[in-house]
């Protein structure tokens, strides 16, 4: 699925991606000389709120090894950004204990479905079982009243 590219917004994402890589100690420039690299990093850090200059800096100075990773990260971020706009495509996360995740994963494999679909299926089954149980209880109570 294609998503609209928003240059200013994505330039900010790219800046943040490279900033985080730099903070983690990775080389974000194409330069080998440490003084030249540091100089270009300092220039880069000043460009945070200048999207056009960020894109120019990336074209001229970014480490070529990061090119594909950056594209993939931005593509994923773009997808999440646009999916978050609509309620039915918005993703939610939950924390599961490992053994719970393992059971859910096995059940999903048995049903040949996603984890989300499996959770939805299990909830509907539980609801159906609860309604059936209430109906049986109601019938028992009615029968008990009739037999008095």
From Swiss-Prot:
It is found in: Cytoplasm. Gene3D superfamilies: MatP, N-terminal domain (1.20.1270.380), Met repressor-like (1.10.1220.10). Pfam families: MatP (PF06303), MatP_C (PF17414). One of its GO terms (cellular component) is cytoplasm. Homodimer. Belongs to the MatP family. This is Macrodomain Ter protein. It comes from Aliivibrio salmonicida (strain LFI1238) (Vibrio salmonicida (strain LFI1238)). The gene is matP.
């Amino acid at each position: 699925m294609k998503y609209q590219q928003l240059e200013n917004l994505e330039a900010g994402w790219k800046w943040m991606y490279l900033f985080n890589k730099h903070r983690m100690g990775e080389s974000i420039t194409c330069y080998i000389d440490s003084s030249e690299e540091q100089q270009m990093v300092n220039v880069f850090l000043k460009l945070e709120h200048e999207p056009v200059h960020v894109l120019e800096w990336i074209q001229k100075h970014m480490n070529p090894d990061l090119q594909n990773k950056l594209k993939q990260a931005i593509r994923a971020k773009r997808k999440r950004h646009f999916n978050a706009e609509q309620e039915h495509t918005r993703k939610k996360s939950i924390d599961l204990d490992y053994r719970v995740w393992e059971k859910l994963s096995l059940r999903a494999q048995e049903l040949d479905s996603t984890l989300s679909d499996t959770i939805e299926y299990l909830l509907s089954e539980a609801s159906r079982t609860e309604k059936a149980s209430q109906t049986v209880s109601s019938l028992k109570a009615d029968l008990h009243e009739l037999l008095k």
